[in-house]
Design a protein with these regions (language model features):
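Short coil/turn segments at alpha/beta junctions that flank glycine-rich nucleotide-binding fingerprints
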Residues: 25-29, 98, 144
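Helix-turn-helix
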Residues: 14, 18, 22-56, 60
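Short secondary-structure transition hinges
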Residues: 93-136
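N-terminal intrinsically disordered/low-complexity leader segments
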Residues: 1-10
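Hydrophobic/aromatic-rich alpha-helical bundle segments in the mid-to-C-terminal region
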Residues: 102-106, 120-124, 128, 142-188
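An amphipathic alpha-helix signature
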Residues: 16, 59, 85, 89, ...
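Short, basic, alpha-helical segments at the C-terminal edge of helix-turn-helix-like DNA-binding modules
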Residues: 63-69
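Hydrophobic alpha-helical connector segments
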Residues: 60, 73-100, 154-159
Length: 194
């Protein structure tokens, strides 16, 4: 890769990082392309060389979130509880290395909830169903006591809602320490694990 190509890639990544932070803090509708350009210390014209619109930039962030959401599906597990433990340990490790992941968590949550997001982008976020896959793992593991009794869908919903809440709080309070992974696992853990 030439020096020029490296500089272009660094600029593109800077735009993505600054946009992620602003979209997470202000939402899609209240973030202006001029705000992103200013945060990235570049002109709006230069920013448009990398992303043709605010919508395309936001879509890139949501696509990154969708790709990141596939990571837990790639985990090899010895028991069903390991899937959740390793997912959270992996998420926390990535966030420590790349804080942009916190902002992407917030953006994905906003995108699922907001009616102001362009529909095709919202569909990308709504197409991620970590809860359904997790509910299937919980249902299978309940038979062996790995998970507490109860509706697997509600347990999955509660677990991932707690994770989303943690990520959103860490995004707005960067000095906050990460909670214990065990605390999150306790939401779904069954008697066999005591």
């Amino acid at each position: 890769m030439s020096i020029r190509d490296e500089q272009k890639e660094q600029r593109r990544w800077l735009i993505i990082m600054k946009a992620a932070e602003l979209f997470a803090r202000n939402g899609y509708a209240d973030t202006k392309i001029g705000d992103i350009a200013k945060a990235a210390n570049m002109s709006i014209g230069l920013l448009f060389h990398y992303f043709e619109s605010k919508e395309k930039l936001y879509e890139e962030l949501v696509r990154m979130g969708a790709e990141f959401s596939k990571k837990p599906q790639e985990i090899n597990i010895n028991n069903p509880l390991d899937y959740f433990r390793m997912s959270i340990e992996g998420i926390f490790a990535i966030v420590r290395e790349q804080p942009i992941v916190l902002y992407i968590f917030v953006i994905m949550g906003q995108t699922r909830r907001s009616e102001t997001i362009p529909p095709h982008i919202r569909e990308i976020a709504l197409g991620i169903d970590q809860m359904e896959q997790s509910a299937e793992i919980i249902a299978a593991g309940q038979e062996y006591g790995y998970f507490r009794e109860g509706d697997p869908n509600l347990l999955s919903f509660t677990f991932w809602s707690a994770v989303q809440g943690v990520m959103e709080q860490l995004a707005v309070t960067p000095a906050m320490e990460f909670p214990s992974v065990a605390w999150l696992i306790d939401i779904i853990k069954g008697d066999k694990n005591d």
